[in-house]
Structure formats: structure tokens, C-alpha cells
């Protein structure tokens, strides 16, 4: 892995700095950006660029995707919005957004289906 933009005389874009600033230490991000040094998967994990390092990454990624796809799609979307907001907002805005998202989810047909499926020990059947 590497942050190659500097090699080509440009800077990272496509939200690179906006996303990395919350996951990668500033000194590490600066070094890797300024030098375009290649780094290993293990270093990517240590630096905060990767969640885990596994053999058979494609199979693991597909299993993770299936697991997420089996969750309430409205709750997954809400969690994505909250995670994105958490990277840039203060606690009051995040708390307000959590309450607003939860109010939309509670007692929705998909939330009820999630509860029922768990209680009945069966796979849920969500609508989108």
C-alpha cells in the first residue's frame, strides 16, 4: 500500500485527508504523504488504514458484506450517516442526530422484524 499522489506531483484527494485525519496519526500521515513510501499490510493495520489483515481477503470481504446486508438496511444507512457525522461534528450535533435517527427506526417495520427474527431465532426478512 502507499499514498502515491506525491510520486506524481499531486496531493491526495477524493476525501483522503478528510477521512484519514480521524484514523491515522498526523505524523504518520505526513510521512507517508510526503514520501509516497510503500507500506505493508501489517503497517497499514498499525497505522489505522486497515481494519484487519487476513489471508483470503476477498472471501473475508464478501462474508462481511453478506453479514452487513443481512441487517436492517435503514439502520445500516443511519449508522453510516452517524459515522460520517462523527468524523466532523461536535458532541451536541452527534447526540441530536443519534436521537433523530433512532426516532425514525424505533417501531418501524424493519426494526420490529429484527426483534422478531432474533426472538424466533430465524433470519430476518427486511423491506427496503
Kindly give the residue locations of the regions a language model identified.
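A general structural signal for well-ordered alpha-helical segments in protein cores
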Residues: 17, 26-29, 65, 75-80, ...
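Short alpha-helical segment immediately N-terminal to, or the first helix within
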Residues: 32-34, 104-105
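CoA-thioester-processing core
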Residues: 1-33, 46-47, 60, 64
Amino acid at each position: 500500500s502507499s499514498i502515491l499522489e506525491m510520486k506524481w506531483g499531486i496531493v491526495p484527494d477524493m476525501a483522503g485527508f478528510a477521512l484519514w485525519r480521524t484514523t491515522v496519526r498526523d505524523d504518520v500521515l505526513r510521512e507517508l504523504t510526503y514520501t509516497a513510501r510503500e507500506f505493508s499490510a501489517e503497517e497499514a493495520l498499525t497505522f489505522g488504514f486497515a481494519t484487519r489483515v487476513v489471508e483470503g481477503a476477498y472471501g473475508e470481504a464478501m462474508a462481511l458484506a453478506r453479514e452487513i446486508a443481512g441487517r436492517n438496511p435503514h439502520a445500516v444507512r443511519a449508522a453510516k450517516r452517524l459515522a460520517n457525522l462523527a468524523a466532523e461534528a461536535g458532541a451536541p450535533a452527534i447526540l441530536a442526530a443519534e436521537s433523530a435517527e433512532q426516532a425514525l427506526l424505533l417501531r418501524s417495520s424493519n426494526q420490529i422484524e429484527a426483534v422478531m427474527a432474533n426472538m424466533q431465532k430465524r433470519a430476518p426478512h427486511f423491506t427496503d
